[in-house]
Amino acid sequence: MSFLSVSRLAPKLLNSKNATYFLVAARNASASTTNLKDVLSDLIPKEQSRIKNFKQQYGKTNIGQITVDMVYGGMRGMKGLVYETSVLDPEEGIRFRGYSIPECQKLLPKAPGGEEPLPEGLFWLLVTGQVPTEEQVKWVSKEWAKRAALPSHVVTMLDNFPTNLHPMSQFSAAITALNSESSFARAYSEGVHKTKYWEFVYEDSMDLIAKLPCIAAKIYRNLYREGSSIGAIDSNLDWSHNFTNMLGYSEAQFTELMRLYLTIHSDHEGGNVSAHTSHLVGSALSDPYLSFSAAMNGLAGPLHGLANQEVLVWLTALQKEMGGEVSDERMRDYIWNTLKSGRVVPGYGHAVLRKTDPRYTCQREFALKHLPNDPMFKLVAQLYKIVPNVLLEQGKAKNPWPNVDAHSGVLLQYYGMTEMNYYTVLFGVSRALGVLAQLVWSRALGFPLERPKSMSTDGLMTLVGAKSG
């Protein structure tokens, strides 16, 4: 059994006597190795062999049917991608390499004195399938600190963007400009063998993740802090701590929130716009900078990465109209009026989930601990009591429960980050952890160019025997 397979068993056994044994078994072989690339070098041949054998035995097996509704409906529910780093269960929510968010909060290393998991630990888990040791997480922190400096042309570019250019446009453009530093693009042009592709994609991915907080902080300072300096990276601090320092936030609780935020927004299966875009563009052997920049252009769309802004706008309008504390009955009437006017309650419902998003739950727990009396949080908590019941009464929603976006903006506002246009940049920094971990594996496993078959409406009608016109 491979280490990846063993580690996937562990979450199912967490409540058993054997849980510790399996967790240790999943880590022992590489626990003494802090270099992530060395661990990958050991794992990749085993996973290649496992998948090769699987394809040989089951390559022609049918795994589902495709309906006309699926083709017209954004391919919802269509099984068409292999994505290793996370799986979204409709009832349980996201699992990172088999581990739920509560399990990750419990098992992943934390900063000294901290209570939230370090994103470096989650990245190690996403890449290897193994829960890392504290030493392995420290290695990642130092490695990213070492790689964080931005090339001068990117700094100049960021400093010369007009202030009316959206933060996500700046973010995407700067990432694209980093393509000049791509190890993969250079190696490919020199004729590197395809079995070595993953090594250079790994190097680019590590460099890019290291540099993203610097890009994001530079954008924030230029737009909202009069272009003040982001300062220097401290190699003794973790990735999130350096990020909050560069943003100009020194409160320890905000740094803890950022660790949680960057962890839970990192990955959400492979079919969402940003993950699928990265996978698609990467399949053309575009380097990680180009692939991730394309993903960020998808994330910038209102239907993907702007949802938490829409929640805050709606909450602010609700507060303005309803005043201070609002009775449950008045709140219920307001929600019904929203629905009857043809609008939705932002932050509720999800394309896949059918229960409360565990990413919402862990943010709620953070708020209950650190800001229980904040008026905006109390409003969010009140909505959590009322909205699902109203949506169930209405009878239209497949999922009446809150998602991650129903809460994240409120937490950021509480700690003083009120610039809503910037929130998607934070989302983007986080999402790099998941999609780039998968990009490394896509090249390691030799995934081909993505090229599905498209059809015209007339072609579909002919296929199913329908009359056109």
From Swiss-Prot:
Q: How does it assemble?
A: Homodimer.
Instruction: Name its cellular compartments.
Output: Mitochondrion matrix
What EC number(s) is this enzyme filed under?
2.3.3.1
Keyword tags: Mitochondrion, Transferase, Transit peptide, Tricarboxylic acid cycle
Gene3D superfamilies (UniProt xref): Citrate Synthase, domain 1 (1.10.580.10), Cytochrome P450-Terp, domain 2 (1.10.230.10)
UniProt superkingdom: Eukaryota
What further fact does the record state?
Citrate synthase is found in nearly all cells capable of oxidative metabolism.
Q: Which SUPFAM superfamilies match?
A: Citrate synthase
Q: Which CDD domains match?
A: ScCit1-2_like
**Root EC class:** transferase
Taxonomic classification, please?
A: Eukaryota, Metazoa, Chordata, Craniata, Vertebrata
Under PANTHER family, the record lists: CITRATE SYNTHASE, CITRATE SYNTHASE, MITOCHONDRIAL
Q: Which GO terms describe its biological process?
A: carbohydrate metabolic process; citrate metabolic process; tricarboxylic acid cycle
Any one annotated GO CC term = mitochondrial matrix
Q: Which reaction does it catalyse?
A: oxaloacetate + acetyl-CoA + H2O = citrate + CoA + H(+)
Annotated transit peptide? 1-30
Q: Where is the signal peptide?
A: none
Primary location:
mitochondrion
Native species: Katsuwonus pelamis (Skipjack tuna)
- Record's family? Belongs to the citrate synthase family.
The pathway to which it is assigned is: Carbohydrate metabolism; tricarboxylic acid cycle; isocitrate from oxaloacetate: step 1/2
Q: Which residues bind oxaloacetate?
A: 359, 431, 451
List the GO molecular function terms. Answer: citrate (Si)-synthase activity; identical protein binding
Q: Which function does this protein serve? A: Key enzyme of the Krebs tricarboxylic acid cycle which catalyzes the synthesis of citrate from acetyl coenzyme A and oxaloacetate.
Where along the chain is the active site annotated?
304, 350, 405
Q: What is this protein called?
A: Citrate synthase, mitochondrial
Q: Which PROSITE patterns match?
A: CITRATE_SYNTHASE
